[in-house]
UniProtKB/Swiss-Prot annotation:
Job description of the protein: Represses a number of genes involved in the response to DNA damage (SOS response), including recA and lexA. In the presence of single-stranded DNA, RecA interacts with LexA causing an autocatalytic cleavage which disrupts the DNA-binding part of LexA, leading to derepression of the SOS regulon and eventually DNA repair.
Descriptive protein name: LexA repressor
Keyword Repressor: yes
Subunit field text: Homodimer.
Gene name of this polypeptide: lexA
Entry similarity comment: Belongs to the peptidase S24 family.
Site keyed Cleavage: positions: A92, G93
Entries under InterPro entries matching the protein: ArsR-like_HTH, LexA, LexA-like, LexA/Signal_pep-like_sf, LexA_DNA-bd_dom, LexA_repressor, Peptidase_S24_LexA, Peptidase_S24_S26A/B/C
Assigned keywords, A-Z: Autocatalytic cleavage, DNA damage, DNA repair, DNA replication, DNA-binding, Hydrolase, Repressor, SOS response, Transcription, Transcription regulation
Catalytic activity of the protein: Hydrolysis of Ala-|-Gly bond in repressor LexA
């Protein structure tokens, strides 16, 4: 394969990656044509086939526009894996003071690579969310956001500047932070600040 072809394939790969990063879904073949100055869609299909053969992209035959840039493809573009900051410990039992310091970083799981939000991780202490599968010592992956829908699991800051992991409910005139443990009572608050929504879970040990 000649060098110009290789460069064109990397150009296509970069456009696919940037488009998915920007809008969370890949471009059409015609959009690729326009972006890389190719007039023939068949030429683009040929480049995509070669990129797939190299292991730079994955395509789903059942979904024409489903194109995913693989880890190998990102390496070819010089893109390092994303990391999530681990910002401390949060309780799943009694609320504790929120920790904002960044302790370390954790590699972003592949299934969250297209998440457009700002993510962080917290280590969970306590057993109030065990019925939701969140155990003492787990790390929750949180998308930073200030609102949530009823029933979603959130990290919330109470009026005493304490953070807790609970299931969120907005009731008539108050907020209910509901534990997922039949032996524990909900936290009832007139005001609550949501720090983010729990979107993932990491556990590094199995009992």
């Amino acid at each position: 394969m000649t060098e110009p072809h290789a460069n064109k394939q990397l150009e296509i790969l970069r456009f696919i990656y940037d488009t998915v990063e920007e809008r969370a879904f890949p471009p059409t073949v015609r959009e690729i044509c326009s972006a890389v100055d190719l007039s023939s869609t068949s030429t683009v299909h040929g480049h995509l086939a070669r990129l797939e053969k190299k292991g730079y992209i994955l395509k789903d035959a059942t979904k024409p526009r489903a194109i995913e840039v693989t880890e190998k493809g990102r390496e070819a573009l010089g893109i390092k894996p994303k990391d999530i900051p681990i910002v401390g410990v949060v309780t799943a039992g009694q609320p504790i003071l929120a920790v904002q310091d960044i302790d370390e970083y954790f590699p972003l799981p592949p299934d969250l690579e297209n998440d457009a939000g700002e993510l962080f991780m917290l280590r969970v202490h306590g057993e109030s969310m065990i019925n939701a599968g969140i155990l003492n010592g787990d790390h929750v992956i949180v998308r930073k956001q200030s609102s949530a829908n009823n029933g979603e699991i959130v990290v919330a800051m109470t009026e005493d500047n304490e953070a807790t992991v609970k299931r969120f409910f907005k009731e008539d005139g108050y907020y209910r932070l509901q534990p997922e443990n039949d032996t524990m009572d909900p936290i009832i608050l007139p005001v609550v600040q949501i720090l983010g929504k729990v979107v993932g879970l990491y556990r590094n040990n199995i009992d």
